[in-house]
Amino acid sequence: KDKRYESSTQAGIDKQFNITIDKVPSQADAYILTFLLEGQVKRTIHNVYVGDVFIAAGQSNMELNYADYYEQPDSFDSNVRDMFTKSDLPSFVDDDNIRFLVVDHKIGSSALPLKSFNSAQWLPANESNAKKLGYLPQLFAEQLRLHHPNIPIGIIQTAWGGTDIARHLRDGDIYANHIAPLDGYNVAGILWYQGENDAAEQEPALQYEANFSTLINQYREVLGDSDLPFLYVQLARYTGYAYTPIVRQAQFSVLHSAAVNTTRNLAMTVSMDTDKGTAKIIHPLGKEILAKRMADQWLAIEGQTTIPSGPQASSAEPVDGDASTVSVSFNTGTAHGLQALEPNRTLRATTSTLTSSTDLPLQGF
């Protein structure tokens, strides 16, 4: 606990410097960072944590938090539309070893524009602050902390509700002000939930696969890791936008796209069965279920084991010309031990009660 870790460097003409301290282990307790010049202490920073940092990017289903979307009666009514009550929302995390920064909805500055409550420091995701952080990233962090209690988790939330993917690409204003300032920053992975805006019109929906492949390459490039873990959510069942199926298929296709420089450490979380019966609203419930699935994928990547995935159908063909009987083929390794299950689309659904066995025939093909 009292061990010292040291390193030295030299500032440039502009008085800026970078320094790397090797092999500092993660721990639940904070470190103290001390800067010395010619043997004299110049600055001391307390409460420094070493752990895994994730970028939470995309649009409103990643940004979705209590303070902005549910706390005030007007915002609650517009987002819920009588589908559920506040008691149905997930519980906040309460963990000082989950820290977060929320990037503000501002453009035009080269510096990362943080929300005013983050202007001076990372905030702990405790009872006082967690309502300001998106449900999905905080619940993802909570899952990781359950598995690794000695590793603090940091979240940099860059998500911006109501935005199309073009604004998140290198030529877009969100990229310029929310992602480019992180150039060279060492992160453990990227969490992405976006695509609703692009599903509203045909042209952006048809371009989504190409744009999303480009985005994955660009984010990995700016962060200096060609196979940086990139975990994303496939769009949910919401039917308010005509081209949602096209975007959803594009998100599936990217898993095996030649346009992605490497599909290693790329993982898609299915959300079709997680909404607890709230598919009529664009911000469905079930973020804790998505968080568990994404955390399982990250832990598999970390452990270099097979990334969990739902069955991935590759083709469907009539049997002997009979359209009433179809033979479905699946990508290798994604369909072992298949059985028909019925989704639990009630407000009481949990990660452990999400499905039940059924003898009903398969539907929806």
Q: Where on the chain are the PLM-derived regions?
A:
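Cell-envelope and extracellular/periplasmic
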Residues: K1-F365
